[in-house]
Amino acid sequence: MSKGVKSKTRSESKPKAHKKQSDTNGTKRKRENEEEISSDEEEADNEKLVSELDQNFDDVAELLDGDVADFKEEKKQKKNKEPKTVSENALQPYAQADESTSGSDKFEDLGLSEPTMRAIKDMGFEKMTKVQEKTIPPLLAGRDVLGAAKTGSGKTLAFLIPAIEMLYSLKFKPRNGTGVIVVSPTRELALQIFGVARDLMAHHSQTLGIVIGGANRRQEADKLMKGVNLLIATPGRLLDHLQNTKGFIFKNLKALVIDEADRILEIGFEDEMKQIIKVLPSDERQSMLFSATQTTKVEDLARISLRAGPLYINVVPETEVSTADGLEQGYVTCDSDMRFLLLFSFLRRNIKKKIIVFLSSCNCVKYFGELLNYIDLPVLDLHGKQKQQKRTNTFFEFCNAKQGILICTDVAARGLDIPAVDWIIQFDPPDDPRDYIHRVGRTARGTGGKGKSLMFLTPSELGFLRYLKAANVPLNEYEFPTNKIANIQSQLTKLIKGNYWLHQSAKDGYRAYLQAYASHHLKTVYQIDKLDLVKVAKSFGFDVPPKVNISIGASGKSIEKKHKKQRRQ
């Protein structure tokens, strides 16, 4: 995947092999973002993926509308409101970003190298976004930065431009090994960052590479040993190479970027990140950490990764609405048994739109994807259990489509810039307001962007609206006339009964839905004991709730009792 990487004789000695550390928590949690390759078939798929990626990335820059400045904007706001202060427990001291900037919002006034400026012009960028204007100058000056910005704000360019300039000024060559590492929570976001970096480095001689779970590890190791100057990585695969790939030179590391730090920690990579930071050299390393939210865990990660006195940059005033201005948001209240019928009716009426539907689990995505395609409502599906080849192809197919429906888990909720999305449908409710904000952030991206979102809630889940209100998220209530909802319940039930594979898939989806529901953090809102399992089962095409084995701790017994009681009714 790295373009222009050439094998050279290295004068440096090989770094000492680090002792392999076992992940004691690895067997306890499932990670959708980094499954390992085990079969020959998948190995072949990934070799094919490697050869195809460069072709796919030719269009990536066009997909990243969040990084494109508004060329029609005639007047730039000169001041933002006072940035939010981090808690007393955070790194001390934090230096607040100066409200005044260089006085110009143009890239050409940053004093960048000729190859970088040529690439920026080739990509069609002229003016900086707020986060770029406030972040790039201090990073070019060598400061460590902790940044907070809304999704779609253009932070990818904000950290890549200084990183590439550093490699250029130090005249990095393949034999010097890796000088910059960018850590990303998901494969798709890593691929997207790789695409932007590839375009930015088009006129540079430095080398670029990517290591992600699900890709061919041997090919990755070969490229690392030849010398990758700027490396994009997901946490698990990066730690694997740091510990086990002999000939991977990282002793000359000059910059570490941690993107979407809160998401990295949320999906269970806290231990890996601590090990990565411990392994990497820190003496002359500049670090950049970006996070949409400043949690205690993010502050802990900042403490061990950033040097003393980092610059804190927040371009989101505390009183500002948390979602994009051009986003029209609403919710609909319906009982569990009507949820799928309403979704089907909505999708059928908006078949010419570009829509993303979020569900709570891989098996739910798999089932509803199979069901909708079976009943002639074409959809794409994206989830963490798919092979990397499938995930990548689906991602680019939906990005390039003018209309279509993508059913997915939260693997697509953070950071991905998918152009011209008309609707975001949250069929299964988000875990908290942060997840809601990142889901709806897939539409109305960039300055002047427009989009709509719709969230499905049952009557017992309406308490979630209080949390959204507290997070400055404005919602309208939508109503759908019952006579406009397609009544296909009897046909659905007959189909599930008569089709063995759909029946099994429906059963797996039903089980996964209950497990996901029981794992919600907001227990006062999402109370599994209040679910009407007969109605929930109907939404999956069952007359009565199927008997399923679910491991959800203390709630398991009460659910099984409820199953038995409601099957008798």
Swiss-Prot record:
One family name in Pfam for this protein: CTE_SPB4
Enzyme class: hydrolase
Domain Helicase ATP-binding: 136-312
Superkingdom to which the source organism belongs: Eukaryota
GO cellular component: nuclear envelope; nucleolus; preribosome, large subunit precursor; small-subunit processome
Compartment(s) where it occurs, according to its Swiss-Prot or TrEMBL record: Nucleus, Nucleolus
Motif (DEAD box): 259-262
Main location: nucleus
Motif (Q motif): 105-133
Binding site for ATP: 149-156
Listed Acidic residues bias regions: 34-45
Molecular function via GO: ATP binding; ATP hydrolysis activity; identical protein binding; RNA binding; RNA helicase activity
Chain residue ranges for the region called Disordered: 1-57, 71-110
Keyword RNA-binding: yes
Domain commentary: The Q motif is unique to and characteristic of the DEAD box family of RNA helicases and controls ATP binding and hydrolysis.
Subunit structure: Associates in the nucleolus with the 60S and pre-60S ribosomal subunits.
Name of the molecule in the record: ATP-dependent RNA helicase HAS1
Organism, scientific name: Meyerozyma guilliermondii (strain ATCC 6260 / CBS 566 / DSM 6381 / JCM 1539 / NBRC 10279 / NRRL Y-324) (Yeast)
